[in-house]
UniProtKB/Swiss-Prot annotation:
Quaternary data: Part of the 30S ribosomal subunit. Forms a tight complex with proteins S10 and S14.
Annotated InterPro entries: KH_dom (IPR004087), KH_dom-like_a/b (IPR015946), KH_dom_type_2 (IPR004044), KH_sf_prok-type (IPR009019), Ribosomal_S3_C_sf (IPR036419), Ribosomal_uS3_bac-typ (IPR005704), Ribosomal_uS3_C (IPR001351), Ribosomal_uS3_CS (IPR018280)
Top-rank taxon: Bacteria
Name of the molecule in the record: Small ribosomal subunit protein uS3
Pfam families: KH_2, Ribosomal_S3_C
Native organism: Nitrosococcus oceani (strain ATCC 19707 / BCRC 17464 / JCM 30415 / NCIMB 11848 / C-107)
Gene Ontology biological process terms in this record: translation
Family stated for the protein in its record: Belongs to the universal ribosomal protein uS3 family.
Length: 223
């Protein structure tokens, strides 16, 4: 089962969290969902050069909070914050509510599966040998602290007539262990022979349940 199902979907509520957090009645659900997809598509195109890994959307009462995880926060913010202000205004216009944008820096992009997959895809588009690209990504991830990594490339590799897939793994990648913190990423490389798919699994360790912090008598917890 762990080999076939999406590594993030099966771990939601265990060691992974949702990328969109909001509540809506049945009549508004589809509208808000399509709005989220439109915002994500716009941000992905607008920030395609900023190495964006993930976009989280929260909708508190009558406003929205968007967290952008990027390896290049300076490109997103822009000179004196001009770019992020323009971005906030455009997203607010799309969503129809006030929007607050947070920038979360990714300090180790070698451990982010989405960025690793995008990097391998870019190398394939530059006609670098796929085995060399996979080996380099695996070596960099293990060097900065990954406990295991697996990379799979599918398509017409090296322009072959018959499509196939090749994969490379180092360390442990326990897909069946639900408490395993496994980051999954996917990217596409557009080559002259067609599209190549790149999948990356990175195992960062096991997450054990932590006790909830106790609230002192007479005080309240604020989330």
């Amino acid at each position: 089962m762990g080999q076939k199902v999406h590594p993030t979907g099966i771990r939601l509520g265990i060691v992974k969290d949702w990328n969109s957090k909001w509540y809506a009645d049945s009549g508004q659900f589809s509208e808000l969902l399509n709005n989220d997809l439109a915002v994500r598509s716009y941000l992905a195109k607008k920030l395609s050069h900023a190495l964006v890994s993930n976009i989280q959307i929260d909708r508190p009462a009558r406003n929205a909070r968007i967290t952008i995880h990027t390896a290049r926060p300076g490109i997103v913010i822009g000179k004196k914050g001009e770019d992020i202000n323009n971005l906030r205004q455009e997203v607010s216009r799309m969503m129809g509510i006030p929007v607050h944008i947070n920038i979360q820096e990714i300090r180790k992009p070698e451990l982010d599966a989405t960025l690793v997959a995008a990097n391998v895809a870019q190398q394939l588009e530059r006609r670098i040998m796929f085995r060399r690209a996979m080996k380099r990504a695996v070596t960099n991830a293990m060097r900065v602290g990954a406990q295991g990594i697996r990379i799979k490339v599918s398509g017409r590799l090296n322009g072959a007539e018959i499509a196939r897939n090749e994969w490379y793994r180092e360390g442990r990648v326990p897909l069946h262990t639900l408490r395993a913190d496994i980051d999954y990423g996917f990217a596409e490389a557009k080559t002259t022979y067609g599209i190549l798919g790149v999948k990356v699994w990175i195992f960062k360790g096991e997450v054990f349940e932590q006790p909830e912090p106790q609230v002192a008598a007479g005080s309240s917890a604020i989330s």
